C-alpha cells in the first residue's frame, strides 16, 4: 500500500532516498527534519504502526498479507519475502527516478531482508543505486551481526556503490555521556552528507560544472565507496577541510587505492588552495583516473 502525502517538484535529476525498516525510517526522519532540498523521501516498513511515525511524504507498507502489519521479528527472510510480495508497489514508487539511495540498519529483519530487494528493483530499472547502511555494535547478539554480514553481501550484489558505517566507530568519536540516540545521529549524518553532496553537485550552479552524467561515471558499478566531509577556518582552512574529509572516522574504508573521486569544494578559497586540495586527494589515492 503506497500512501502519498504531498506532491514533489520536478528536478533536473530525480533523486530518491528510501529508508527501509526502523533504522532506515529514522534516518529519513532526520533528513526530513534537516530540510534537505532536491530529494524525494520514501519510508518502507513491514510494521504499519512504526511506518505511521515516518516523516517521509511517501510511505510504503510491504508484506501486508505476510506480516499482517507487524514487524519482521528480526528475521531477514521475512523482510525479503515481504518486499517480494510488494514488488509491484516498490517498482511503481521508484519509476522515473535517476538515482536511488537505499538506507537501513543491517542486522534486523525488515531492513536486512528488504533493502537488497528494493535495491535490485532500482538497479534493474537502470537507476544509479547507492546503499548507505550501518553494521551492528559488537556487543549486540552474534546472530544479529551474522544477519548483517549476509545482508551486506546481498545488498552489495544489487547496488552500484555501497557505503558501510560500523556502529562501533561511533564509540571512537563520542564521549561517555553521549546517549545512544545522539550517537546514532552521527551515523545518519554520513547519509545526509552523502545525499546533500551529490544533490548539490548536480543541482547547484558552480564554477566548474558537473552534471548527473559525471556522477554516474564515478559511481556506476563501483562497489564499496568512501565518503568524507571536512570543514576548515582560518589561514589553513582548505587543507584542514581536506584532511578531515580524507580521515572520515566513521567509516572502516580509506581513500587509498580509490579509482575515481568526486571532489566538491564550497567556500571562498583561492585557486592555489583549490589546487593544493586536489593534489592532496590525488596523493591520498595514488591513481588519478578520474577526479
Predicted region positions:
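Tubulin/FtsZ superfamily GTPase core signature
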Residues: 1-289
Amino acid at each position: 500500500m503506497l500512501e502519498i502525502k504531498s506532491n514533489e517538484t520536478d528536478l533536473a535529476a530525480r533523486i530518491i532516498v528510501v529508508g527501509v525498516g526502523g533504522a532506515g525510517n529514522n534516518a529519513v526522519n532526520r533528513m526530513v527534519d534537516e530540510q534537505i532540498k532536491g530529494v524525494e523521501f520514501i519510508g518502507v516498513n513491514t510494521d504499519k504502526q512504526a511506518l505511521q511515525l515516518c516523516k517521509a511524504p511517501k510511505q510504503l507498507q510491504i508484506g501486508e498479507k505476510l506480516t499482517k502489519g507487524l514487524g519482521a521479528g528480526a528475521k531477514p527472510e521475512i523482510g525479503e519475502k515481504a518486499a517480494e510480495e510488494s514488488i509491484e508497489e516498490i517498482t511503481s514508487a521508484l519509476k522515473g527516478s535517476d538515482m536511488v539511495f537505499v538506507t537501513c540498519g543491517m542486522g534486523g529483519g525488515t531492513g536486512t531482508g528488504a533493502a537488497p530487494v528494493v535495491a535490485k528493483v532500482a538497479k534493474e530499472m537502470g537507476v544509479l543505486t547507492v546503499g548507505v547502511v550501518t553494521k551492528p555494535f559488537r556487543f549486540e547478539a552474534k546472530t544479529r551481526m551474522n544477519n548483517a554480514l549476509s545482508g551486506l553481501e546481498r545488498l552489495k550484489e544489487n547496488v552500484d556503490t555501497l557505503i558501510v558505517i560500523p556502529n562501533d566507530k561511533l564509540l571512537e568519536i563520542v564521549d561517555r555521556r553521549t546517549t545512544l540516540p545522539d550517537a546514532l545521529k552521527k551515523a545518519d549524518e554520513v547519509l545526509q552528507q552523502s545525499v546533500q553532496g551529490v544533490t548539490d553537485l548536480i543541482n547547484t550552479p558552480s564554477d566548474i560544472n558537473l552534471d548527473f552524467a559525471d556522477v554516474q561515471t564515478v559511481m556506476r558499478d563501483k562497489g564499496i565507496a568512501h565518503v568524507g566531509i571536512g570543514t576548515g577556518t582560518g589561514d589553513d582552512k582548505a587543507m584542514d577541510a581536506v584532511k578531515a574529509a580524507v580521515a572520515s572516522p566513521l567509516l572502516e574504508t580509506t581513500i587509498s587505492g580509490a579509482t575515481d573521486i568526486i571532489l566538491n569544494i564550497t567556500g571562498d578559497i583561492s585557486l592555489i588552495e583549490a589546487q593544493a586540495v586536489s593534489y592532496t586527494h590525488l596523493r591520498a589515492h595514488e591513481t588519478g583516473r578520474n577526479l
